[in-house]
């Protein structure tokens, strides 16, 4: 696919699953800018260091399939198979990913194999995770393929203290990971992920050049593009989908701040909005801190939303010497 935006690519996937002719299975491949995709049943606040994502301009979205959170960048190639429901058994990832493994074996990664519920491994290290979704007698299975991903980012993203947030969402399970590039034959260790993608496609289809399978390329109409853009706007780029779909959870943060004292914040968040707030501590204030707690109730629990709302008040009136900026950091640290 043309886009490097995961939100557009997921919108395209969903649209094609629902509307494309799948008399022949569809195979989609795409490469995207740095992003994190959480599973359908996950809580972004619990899974991720959202401050790190925001500061490093890493896109966040939610997919419609289950599973855990994944990080993609331009060193990753994602792929999707869309088939009739009766052509694939839900959860049979080994069957779905077999063509990918066969192609990788031809390219030199002979130790690559399926393992666990839905992963691909090489020498005991994970390089691909997969998930499935079924609807209207169709199933799509999509997955990542870590070719040359910046692995140093992974631990920075998937780090949130369990003491800070408690919810009933599905947690991600960290696994030791690797990139597949170093396991390929030297002639296939390309500098660009796009070149790896093209070679993998050639191996999958048994051709020497992509021009030989040009007729298999799916062309989108203007109506298709408009429908996909609508999905992008209303779903994958919409905070209500990304955050509002999160299961109810509690946020707890207790810290000591110089010249302020101890500040202990407890929030309940339901459907992405603060439903209850309590602030405790040994700090001083000119106004009852309960007014600050009440001010938070009903607000969207998003950094940008709370930052905008706090422009209406001065936190230091309720918690002496605490700036709006420091209070904001306390709510999202």
Language-model region placement:
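Long, positively charged amphipathic alpha-helical accessory segments at protein N-termini or as interdomain linkers
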Residues: 100, 104-107, 136-243, 287-333
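Structured beta-strand/loop patches that form or line metal/cofactor-binding pockets in enzymes
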Residues: 223-270
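Beta-rich nucleic-acid/ligand-interaction surfaces
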Residues: 114-130, 219-232
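FAD-binding core of FAD-dependent oxidoreductases
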Residues: 63-78, 120-122, 126, 131-139
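Short beta-strand elements
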Residues: 131-132, 145, 255, 263-281
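Contiguous, small/hydrophobic- and glycine-enriched helical/loop subdomains that border
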Residues: 76-118
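N-terminal lobe of the biotin/lipoate ligase/transferase fold
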Residues: 1-91
């Amino acid at each position: 696919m043309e886009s490097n935006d995961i939100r557009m690519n997921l919108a395209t996937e969903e649209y094609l699953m629902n509307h494309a002719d799948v008399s022949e299975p569809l195979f989609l491949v795409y490469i995207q800018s740095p992003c994190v995709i959480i599973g359908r049943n996950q809580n972004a606040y619990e899974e991720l260091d959202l401050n790190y994502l925001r500061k490093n301009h890493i896109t966040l979205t939610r997919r419609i399939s289950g599973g855990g959170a994944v990080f993609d960048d331009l060193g990753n190639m994602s792929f999707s198979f869309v088939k009739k429901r009766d052509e694939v058994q839900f959860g049979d990832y080994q069957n779905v990913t077999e063509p990918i493994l066969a192609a990788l074996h031809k390219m030199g990664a002979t130790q690559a194999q399926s393992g666990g519920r839905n992963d691909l491994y090489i020498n005991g290290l994970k390089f691909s995770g997969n998930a499935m979704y079924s609807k209207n007698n169709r199933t799509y299975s999509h997955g990542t393929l870590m070719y040359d991903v910046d692995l140093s980012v992974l631990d920075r993203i998937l780090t949130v203290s369990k003491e800070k947030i408690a919810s009933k969402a599905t947690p991600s399970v960290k696994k030791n990971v690797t990139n597949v590039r170093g396991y390929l034959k030297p002639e296939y260790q390309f500098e660009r992920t796009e070149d790896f993608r093209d070679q993998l496609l050639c191996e999958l289809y048994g051709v020497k050049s992509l021009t030989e399978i040009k007729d298999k390329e799916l062309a989108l109409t203007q109506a298709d593009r408009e429908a996909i853009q609508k999905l992008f706007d209303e779903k994958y780029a919409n905070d209500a989908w990304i955050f509002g779909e999160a299961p109810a959870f509690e946020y707890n943060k207790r810290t000591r701040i110089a010249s302020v004292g101890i500040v202990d914040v407890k929030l309940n968040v339901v459907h992405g909005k603060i439903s209850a707030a309590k602030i405790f501590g040994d700090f001083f204030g000119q106004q009852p801190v309960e007014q600050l707690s009440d001010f938070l109730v009903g607000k969207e629990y998003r950094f940008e939303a709370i930052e905008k709302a706090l422009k209406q008040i001065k936190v230091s009136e309720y918690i002496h010497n605490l700036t709006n900026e420091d209070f904001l950091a306390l709510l999202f640290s």
